Swiss-Prot record:
First-listed, main subcellular location of the protein, grouped into a coarse class: membrane
Name of this chain's protein: Putative transport protein HI_0035
GO MF terms, alphabetically ordered: monoatomic cation transmembrane transporter activity
SUPFAM superfamilies given in the database record: TrkA C-terminal domain-like
PANTHER family: K(+)_H(+) ANTIPORTER SUBUNIT KHTT (PTHR30445), TRANSPORT PROTEIN YIDE-RELATED (PTHR30445:SF3)
Alphabetized Pfam families for the sequence: Asp-Al_Ex (PF06826), TrkA_C (PF02080)
Residues forming coiled coils: none
Residue intervals of the RCK C-terminal domain: 191-275, 277-360
Any one GO CC term of the record: plasma membrane
The organism's taxonomic lineage, starting at the top: Bacteria, Pseudomonadati, Pseudomonadota, Gammaproteobacteria, Pasteurellales
Tree of life domain: Bacteria
Species of the source: Haemophilus influenzae (strain ATCC 51907 / DSM 11121 / KW20 / Rd)
Keyword Transmembrane carried by entry: yes
Amino acid sequence: MSDIAITISLLALVAVIGLWIGHWKIRGVGLGIGGVLFGGIIVAHFTNQYGLKLDAHTLHFVQEFGLILFVYTIGIQVGPGFFSSLRKSGLKLNAFAILIILLGSIAVVLVHKIADVPLDIALGIYSGAVTNTPALGAGQQILAELGVPQTTVTMGVSYAMAYPFGICGILLAMWLIRLFFNVKVDDEAARFNAESSQDKESLHNISLKVTNQNLDGLTLIQIPGFSDEEVVCSRLKRDDMEIVPKASTEIRTNDILQLVGDDNSLAKMRLIIGHEVDAPTVAYSGEIRSERVVVTNEKVLGKKIRALGIHQKYGVVISRLNRAGIELVPTGNTTLQFGDVLHMVGRSDVLNQAISVIGNAQQKLLQVQMLPVFIGIGLGVLVGSIPFYIPGFPVALKLGLAGGPLVVALILARIGTIGKLYWFMPPSANLALREIGIVLFLAVVGLKSGGSFFDTLVNGSGLEWMGYGIFITFVPLIIVGTIARLYGKLNYLTICGLLAGSMTDPPALAFANEIKEDNGAAALSYATVYPLVMFLRIMSPQLLAVLLWAA
């Protein structure tokens, strides 16, 4: 067999063993996807003994491509809610993440000064303890420029010693915070869903009887509130007749209007129109029905609802719009994106025609448009390769192959649609690509660090380095995690994502996601802090090297 064939076969073996190890649980807690790393260490130990040669270029490619796949799909998943989360809680989350980095940097200074650990080894331990490979590369480059010899070897070995237990330190911190605060995961997930409006309707229906005499004879659009497009009138009942009103429909006293909107807007309309009645709000007569319709027609992507003329042509009202789990009041200026769910109300004989304009092709929701995937990955790699020059630093800083694809994916997922290209990815496809990516990445890291792992552990300073690594990993996490829970009042699942993001650690995020698989709290907080943290993690070893070298 060729070296490449042997390498691929061993990667598959590592994945099988690692995923099996990941399913082991002690008191309900297991390594999860992190087991692949230890599977790689075990396999690497035996391949080193038997002298099997692995292709270095193949390993390097698989590691980087796996990482790119993982962070890109994470960005696509959380992109629609990332920017709104940044406005609501981003400052607090990033402040906690910066505190973790600051405490970790102080720990490195203590290890170097008090324990008298050489600078190159201290920075290698730091990079492994915070599970950040770009930090390792940045530290090696600046130490080489400062004239420190053999940094690649010494930093690489110390990094390998600290990395596996760096992951364990994060998982241990999550577990201890859960035990210490007696966290009930289901309650935390329900609280997150309630706060993010994922498990409750942000819009409501009410039926108002027109008792304001001043409204008699006015058209619907002339009534204050409708012109602001904060409320939608989905139907009008007059005596025994029920219709879907248009903007030009005249309103009469004693008409009953069914309105859709948020609580504040509906309260204003109650003051303007009249009192609320107990008319049915969900049952529709035989002539009028409602449907939930998914936007799948490529011809309407990126277009405003007003431009489609749905209401003018068919007399159909779009009363609600659900995008990425968030319900909105649609207006004429709302731009449609692939996967938007519209609540449409109209006469049975014309509603199907209006639905055909929107699409509602369920099979399209199961398909992955591959062209946008590779456009996004390509743009992400380019962005990650752009150097940022900061005065006083001899080495240019970069987002790298992890940060670049993540930032681009967040932006593209937020944009949603460009022409006929859409960055919607079915959840099952997203999960499959994400799992494949993280398994490939961890398998290679395990194979690379496992060759000298046991020898350094038994005969060298491995245990000492591990101890320093656990100190650098665990102490900042447990301190900030406790503060975030006690004083920041953060959701436990959000804290788990924060801890994983502050260490730029995909395996820890995978573990956090597995705590409550159907909840996006951890992934959202991870993505909220990741871009800034990645930049600071790359910059911090360079800053530490300059400061400690000068001292």
